[in-house]
Amino acid sequence: MAAAEAAAAVGKQQQKGGGGRGGGGGGPAPFLTKTNQMVEESATDEVISWGKEGRSFVVWKPVEFARDLLPLHFKHCNFSSFVRQLNTYGFRKVVPDRWEFANGNFRRGEQGLLSGIRRRKATTPQSSKSCGSGVNVAFPPPLPPLPPEPSATTSSGNDRSSSSASSPPRADITSENEQLRKDNQTLTMELARARRHCEELLGFLSRFLDVRQLDLRLLMQEDMRAAAGGVGGEQRVQEHAREEKCVKLFGVLLDDTHGAATRKRARCEEAAASERPIKMIRIGEPWVSVPSSGPARCGGDN
């Protein structure tokens, strides 16, 4: 495989003269130097290479990278350990859907900037597994799952709305209590008006009767029965009002219509007496006008 041969060639070059570079003093860390060498090697561009602008590098084939390149440079084949090391030195992932990492001091052709990259915190050493017959490729945790489809979200929202609708909210109970309180106030006002009406009725009756001899409780019970009776109660009230307007003669009610007719007849007779024609009776000579003493007739009587 071309990638494996290129990796072997890079390993031989490092064993010849580049292994101890950056090991002490103020030089860059060995991890940064080895990573830069892997990215700069053009023979392995199909596995790992620089980005478009040379300010980041991309691991195109993580499996081949962990199997062929990591054992040559870091003596292990754990890709997740390599990613953790990058995070320790301040590298960040640029694109979510691929393994592209960047750091402000990690640029193409500018190895002198590697000394400016510092380790953020010490990590506990992890025992790397040897890459013997089988290659152990451990990848970082997968990316977070995609959001659910709209149909699932809609169904879950409907379930929440149905569950919330099953339990009545506190606002509905409060409004119902307020409505009951208003109804109670209305009934209290109607009762007060009924009592005032009863008092006014008693005051009116006191003009014609001795109210002190009346049993007020019986009157109130009768008034309640009349109100409950509906139309029958209204008729009894009308009869009671008619009795107040009429006059009793020896215990018998004299209808007001009869009185009106009597008054009308009396007025008619008075008018007839004033407008009655004088009959002329001839009693010899000369003519003498003698008024007739016969009864006058009303214009409406036959």
From Swiss-Prot:
Subcellular location: Cytoplasm; Nucleus
Region of interest: Disordered: 1-33, 116-184
Principal localisation: cytoplasm
Short name of any one Pfam family annotated for the protein: HSF_DNA-bind
Keywords: Coiled coil, Cytoplasm, DNA-binding, Nucleus, Phosphoprotein, Stress response, Transcription, Transcription regulation
Gly residues bias spans: 16-28
Gene Ontology molecular function, alphabetical: DNA-binding transcription factor activity; sequence-specific DNA binding
Span of the annotated motif Nuclear export signal: 211-218
Cross-referenced InterPro entries: HSF_DNA-bd, WH-like_DNA-bd_sf, WH_DNA-bd_sf
Assembly behavior: Homotrimer.
UniProt function note: Transcriptional regulator that specifically binds DNA of heat shock promoter elements (HSE).
Name this polypeptide is given: Heat stress transcription factor B-1
